[in-house]
Amino acid sequence: MDNRTARFLKTRFQKYYKNAEIGLPDHLPNREWAFIFFDSMPDKMMHRHKAFGSPGEALDYLYGMAPAHVYNSTAYYEYPDARKMNEKNWLGAELIFDLDADHLPDAPKNYADMLELVKKETFKLMDFLLEDFGFSEQEIELVFSGGRGYHFHVRSPKVLKLGSAERREIVNYLSGRDLDFKYFFREVAMDGEFGTGSKTFKGMKNVPFKCTLVGYDSGWGRRIALYLTDYMKAECGKRYKKDMFPELRRYEKVGDTTIKKLISLTNSENGLKDILEKGRLDFDVRNFKDIAAYFMRESVEDFLHRFGTSVDEPVTADIKRLIRVPGSLHGGSGMLVKKLALSELEKFDPLTDAVVFGERPVKVTVLKPFSVQLKGKDLRVEEGIQEVPEYAAVYLICRGVAEYGHRRNQPGPV
């Protein structure tokens, strides 16, 4: 990035920061801040160990300096501006999750498709936080990163003092990597508060057992019930019986009679409903518990792809992490780091809703062919001098595929 291009971006960012609504963190005086300035680009030298005593001080700094990237600590410190980390006196930290397309298997290369995939992962993580961990919506802050994903900030006394090891355990739970299906498919005693039917014969108590899906109504048990019943419905929706349940036909305990009973169970009035709502596995299908457990083991990769979520483990485990500030601009895209209510995620379109610059025509020198969709328009540029809307110019320059103005001996638009 040449000096003229850096100056152009800085003036555009400064104009934005003049009236920007910045999501300043709670306990502002206890947060460390860090910045990358346009003057250091493209080296991206980070200036950190900065602290602010008041909102006005922080906002004045952003307007005056117009940084390319703005971060604050997820941790709370007694002395956030201390130059050495061991002198800051760590007081606790938010629980942070970073969902980025870089960490998703087979993420599409197209930017719009990439963001759509990350949004689906974001919904899955939201379900974990609200349903499995029981955090309230008021304890969760959702932020579009301004780049390729989303950040979750969990601010709760329950997580404040968690160490790195405990935070890694949470990541493991989210991924499902340590799931043991034997735990979920079990025989449970029908005695006492769990049921009736115990009998005593010759002084010996006989306690009957029933096959059940443990935890069917919450957490991973609920996801197993959904996956299993969805599979059974899909198989019975096939046209020919010979094509149904091919995965189960490979199991030694499954023959033609079992397949017929599985079809009958699936098509019955309450069969799948009983699995979902009661965790029931004691049907007129021999070894149904073992068959279900076998299917889950064989399908574990697809199951975890559907229900697990891939967060950036080092980010969550780091109790002294720096993260982008909501309301700031992402120097790698020029887009807004935007805070969202959880209810806003469904309709949120980052390629429109996180674009803050206007339509004023700007001449740029495109360094290589590039295409992207912004503000509902397909933008395609070729190498050479191009005139594009300001929002597109900022994006192209931040992505490193264009420079401001025009160079000599560069071809103009055809």
UniProtKB/Swiss-Prot annotation:
Cofactor: Mg(2+); Mn(2+)
Segments forming a coiled coil: none
Record key words, sorted: DNA replication, DNA-directed RNA polymerase, Magnesium, Manganese, Metal-binding, Nucleotidyltransferase, Primosome, Transcription, Transferase
GO BP annotation list: DNA replication, synthesis of primer
GO CC, alphabetical: DNA-directed RNA polymerase complex; primosome complex
InterPro entries: DNA_primase_S, DNA_primase_ssu_euk/arc, DNA_primase_ssu_PriS
Annotated GO MF terms: DNA-directed RNA polymerase activity; metal ion binding
Known EC number: 2.7.7.-
UniProt cross-references to SUPFAM superfamilies, sorted A to Z: Prim-pol domain
Active-site residues, Swiss-Prot/TrEMBL: 98, 100, 312
Protein purpose: Catalytic subunit of DNA primase, an RNA polymerase that catalyzes the synthesis of short RNA molecules used as primers for DNA polymerase during DNA replication. The small subunit contains the primase catalytic core and has DNA synthesis activity on its own. Binding to the large subunit stabilizes and modulates the activity, increasing the rate of DNA synthesis while decreasing the length of the DNA fragments, and conferring RNA synthesis capability. The DNA polymerase activity may enable DNA primase to also catalyze primer extension after primer synthesis. May also play a role in DNA repair.
Protein family according to the UniProt entry: Belongs to the eukaryotic-type primase small subunit family.
Quaternary structure annotation from Swiss-Prot or TrEMBL: Heterodimer of a small subunit (PriS) and a large subunit (PriL).
The protein's name in its UniProt record: DNA primase small subunit PriS
Organism: Methanosarcina barkeri (strain Fusaro / DSM 804)
Gene that this polypeptide is encoded by: priS
